C-alpha cells in the first residue's frame, strides 16, 4: 500500500498473505520503478527549489488518499466475500487479489504524476510491464495452484468474484486519471501567471 492506511487494510489478512502482497507484488513493481525512465518533458520544466523535499506536500496528500482508498476497498471486498459468499476465506482471497491489482493502478497513477497512464509512455519500460504482468499472473497462481492455496490459505475464485476484485483497481486508476487531468488543465494557467511576473 501507499501509507499506514493501506497497511491497515490488510488487518483481516493472514501474515503469509500480507507477506505475499509486499514481497511478491509490491517489491518487484517498486524495484523496477526505482530504475524507471525520467518523466516526459522534465527538461522543459523549471528547476525544483534546492530546499524542496523529495516528497512534497501534494504528493503526501495523494499517497494518504490512495492508501485510505486501498484500505477501505480491501475491507469492503472482505465483507463482500463474507456476506455474499458466506466465507472469510473467499473474502481474504478476493482482498489479496484486489490488493495486487490495485498496486498496478497505484504504479500507473504515480509513475508520471501528471501524464496519463493511457499514453505511449506507459509502454516505454518493458521491465515494468513484466512486473505488472507478474502481479496479474501471480495473483492467478496463488488462488489456482493447490500448493499455494495450502500455503497462503486461499481458495479458487469464480469469474464474478474476479470482476469484483478488479473494480477497486479500475476505480483507483480512473480517479488518478481525473486528478492528472485537473493538474494538466491548471498547468498552462500556472505557467502563464509565472511568465507574467517575470520582467522583460
Regions found by a protein language model. Name each.
Residues 5-6, 83-86, 147-200:
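Cytosolic catalytic headpiece
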